[in-house]
Amino acid sequence: MKIDDLSNALRHEGGLSRRLFLAYAASLSSIPLLSRYASAAPPHVFTSDPFSFGVASGDPDHESVILWTRLAPKPLEPGGGMPKAPVEVHWEIAEDNSFKKIVQSGKVNATPELGHSVHIEPRDLKPDHWYSYRFKSGDATSPVGRTRTLPAPDASPDKLRFAVTSCQNFEAGLFTAYQQMAADKPDFVFHLGDYIYEYASGRNGKIRTHQGPEIESLDQYRIRYAQYKGDKDLQAIHAA
């Protein structure tokens, strides 16, 4: 008895009689059930830190926020030094920096199709509230990031601190301004673009230079983003 036979019965026999149901049930009982762990990726052993880009969060509303990281132990290589297979990533979001008050946690597979990046969207969070979050994969743990939700739609907060940035060109200068931005402890940061530039190496490279030619392919874009996101000051403001 096949699954298709059951489907045909539902379509053409006007539903299942008790006799047919028992016959199909007996047949289907011989099909092995998949373990709930069947799709889980095996633990991965890293030889260097896979969280080379740190962590980031964004796009909040009053009850949710998006958490991000990417596994890339060799960030400036195609594929980021990762295997062409899914790798399991655990995540936690807590009300304290020591993670004694974890409010949500889970696990997800980081896949090669998405460059082994993960996007988590925990919901049912408190409005106008700070949280800490982190990721784990294999024996590696990411830096801790801070994030916050928006005030409730009908709220009138006394104050909110915003920071605004744009046009960060890796070749044109260092990102040390983000040190001061993080020290100012903004509630939210708006990046208006451009986040990266596609130019070939050396066009503005008086301070430091892009890697490779003008970017066109997906691998080239990922490597260019890796150059930018490898900057520790940029990582710090993303995590602040």
PLM region spans:
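Divalent metal-dependent phosphoesterase catalytic cores across multiple superfamilies
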Residues: 10, 42-240
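N-terminal secretory signal peptides
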Residues: 1-16, 27
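Boundary at the C-terminal end of the N-terminal hydrophobic targeting segment
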Residues: 38-40
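Bacterial N-terminal signal peptides
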Residues: 26-32
